[in-house]
Amino acid sequence: MATMISNLPRDLMEEILSRVPLKSMRAVRLTCKNWHTLSITISESLAKMYISKTTRESREGESTIITLMNYKLCLTSLVVDVDPYIEHKGKLTCFNLEHQVKISQVFYYEDDTITTRLVVWNPYWGQTRQIKTRYSHHAFSGRDSTYMFNYSLGYENKNSCRSHKLLRFIDYHWNYRGLHQFFWYEIYDFDSDLWTTLDVTPHWFIVISQSGVSLKGNTYWCARKRSGGYSDHIICFDFTRERFGPLLPLPFSFIDRHHSCVILSCVSEEKLAVLFQYKDHYYKNVVEIWITAKLEAEMVSWSKFLRINTGPIIHTSFFINEEKKVAIGFNDNRKTINIIGEAGYFRELDLGEHAEPYRRRHVFSYVPSSVQIKETAPGNIKKHQSSIETRLFDRNMLRLVAFEKKVSE
């Protein structure tokens, strides 16, 4: 009597799944309900074994990257060699969302991505979790105004398990003299399914034109003192303590540096990297990249990774390949990525698609992980906000309405 593939023993199905290439996992999940369920509930140890096996079998110098262009996320293989090249693996699709969405902002966190619709998505497992915000708000677009929601995903360790949280904040200021400003920091807990207002009075400005960088469960941003000056610091949000740390200095000076730009990245989920780009006295582009030698809650030290004179411009985001000692990031022509390295090494690779003007572009190295997104259990009784939190929320909403009225006058 023939055995249907959906009725195979679990251990045999797990063995089969462990041999499926990552790019074919989505097709396997769509085969039948049993395969889809098993691919999601499969043990973390097996998932770790599979990911480790895939990593070992990668070609030398190969990196898997995700790019955000024209509201789409695409998975690409980049091989850095004497003659580097790219292989397009396809568009990343949230096939378990009711409708496909345009992606305008991405925060990368150890294999999870989050968009401004507040969908947390793990491409490896094919899991998503939609998070309901407490209010909907559109940006005020006025003279000398700067505004954007900022999001970051992190965790604290509870009983050897990761308890995930989502930070969302507004730091809304009208003109840089600080005459009118509004800020509101709140955090969402995946376990309780509740939002909580945080007691934060920032003495800094976070560079909101860039996404934060996740490292070991916490998030880092480029920042500057609220009193003014350059964006010559980083700041960390600790998801365990639910608070910001002190401003930590970057390893370079902005004095006599024209048209400067600072971009933050991470290295192998172990260190931070920062790219400093500026024009020298001869108006030639200079790129410096530094990596953290030591990073603690209240101190940081840096080591220089790379310096390139008259190098090409890198926009928005970047990542590095430590082994090959190169940096990879978007060109300003909106359709190619630059690879820069020592001794004037430079290669330009065409992505095959031109990015639309004024749309966000993002590139980052992608490493699958066994972390799964905790779902809200069906039939759970919804917890209610405390009366104190309700009053804080109502007060902040009144402050926001009053602030926007003042700015629009």
Curated annotation (Swiss-Prot):
SUPFAM superfamilies: F-box domain, Galactose oxidase, central domain. Pfam families: F-box, FBA_1. It comes from the Eukaryota. Residues 2-49 form the F-box domain. Keywords: Kelch repeat, Repeat. The keyword GTP-binding does not apply. Kelch repeats lie at residues 169-218, 221-266. Coiled coil: none annotated. The keyword Repeat applies. PANTHER family: F-BOX ASSOCIATED UBIQUITINATION EFFECTOR FAMILY PROTEIN (PTHR47993:SF37), OS09G0372900 PROTEIN-RELATED (PTHR47993). This is F-box/kelch-repeat protein At1g48625.
